[in-house]
């Protein structure tokens, strides 16, 4: 009898859990909008236009995801420090903010399959004649303080002089535009965009690293994760990914290869 009671109790708990999980998407629909965190600190991934509206690659992805959900989106501009905690505290439903999928982050939030990839690239003044990593030695190179770019520079060109900034965009960009630095190392997507709009710069063709970027959400919601993964798979296979990438990085840009599972 006790065994039957335990089984019945477990079944009730499983049904209740399944109902709660299925209700997460329904909660968004009942609310009438989806809350999505984006990072508006760097073109072309996310920034504000002249009308102070959120625009950019990630913003377009978020809008398409909201359309798939059938509700409008309400954006929050999130910092790298706050985005995970805002998901876990349920202040946000999703984060589409150029978030790298790492084992450490995957322990506390769930990630969709990749909808973009990131890697480091080198940008330089054309007058600096930087063609290889070795050419950075003896040059002033702007990097974010304590970032992977900082560590990469110290390893790849120990003779370079780091010029530190806490925010590559806009502070590091300004240093380059004012020629207070010869070169810079940052996320390839940002630097490709910067070089396409500033004739004084050129980028090295190699992208160093290949880090997947995913849509993040609070753990414990397999229904929402499945929904978002289906969206990303269609986003890649339908050609929307390539079109969106070229919209923001230029018609001649080559979107990094993604696998739609």
Regions found by a protein language model. Give the residues of each.
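Extended ligand-binding regions for polar small-molecule ligands
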Residues: 59-68, 134, 139-140, 147-148, ...
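Periplasmic-binding protein-like
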Residues: 116-124, 170-171, 188, 192-233, ...
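Bilobed "Venus flytrap"/periplasmic-binding protein-like clamshell domains
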Residues: 35-44, 54-67, 100, 121-171, ...
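A ligand-binding cleft/hinge motif common to bilobed small-molecule-binding domains
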Residues: 82-85, 99-107, 152-155, 177-209
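Short helix-initiation/N-cap motifs at beta->coil->alpha
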Residues: 75-85, 163-178, 211
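Ligand-binding clefts/hinges and TM-proximal coupling segments of bilobed small-molecule sensing domains
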Residues: 148-167, 199-204, 233-261
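Extracytoplasmic small-molecule ligand-binding "clamshell" domains
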Residues: 22-98
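Acidic, polar ligand-binding/catalytic clefts
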Residues: 63, 67, 72-135, 202-207
């Amino acid at each position: 009898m006790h065994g039957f009671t335990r089984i019945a109790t477990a079944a009730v708990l499983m049904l209740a859990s399944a109902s709660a999980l299925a209700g997460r998407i329904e909660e968004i629909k009942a609310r009438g909008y989806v809350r999505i965190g984006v990072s508006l600190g760097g073109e072309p991934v996310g920034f504000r236009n002249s009308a102070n509206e959120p625009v950019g690659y990630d913003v377009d992805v978020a809008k398409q995801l909201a359309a798939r959900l059938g509700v409008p989106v309400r954006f929050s501009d999130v910092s790298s420090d706050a985005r995970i905690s805002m998901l876990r505290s349920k202040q946000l439903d999703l984060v589409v903010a150029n978030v790298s999928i790492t084992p450490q982050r995957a322990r506390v939030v769930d990630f969709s399959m990749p909808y973009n990839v990131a890697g480091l690239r080198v940008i330089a003044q054309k007058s600096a004649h930087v063609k290889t990593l070795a050419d950075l030695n003896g040059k002033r190179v702007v990097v974010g303080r304590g970032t992977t770019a900082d560590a990469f520079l110290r390893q790849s060109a120990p003779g370079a002089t780091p010029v530190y900034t806490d925010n590559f965009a806009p502070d590091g960009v300004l240093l380059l535009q004012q020629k207070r630095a010869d070169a810079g190392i940052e996320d390839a997507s940002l630097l490709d965009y910067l070089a396409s709009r500033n004739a004084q710069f050129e980028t090295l063709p190699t992208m160093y690293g290949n880090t997947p970027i995913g849509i993040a959400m609070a753990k414990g919601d397999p229904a929402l994760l499945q929904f978002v993964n289906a969206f990303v798979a269609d986003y890649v296979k339908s050609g929307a990914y390539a079109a969106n990438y070229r919209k923001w990085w230029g018609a001649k840009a080559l979107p990094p290869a993604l696998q739609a599972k």
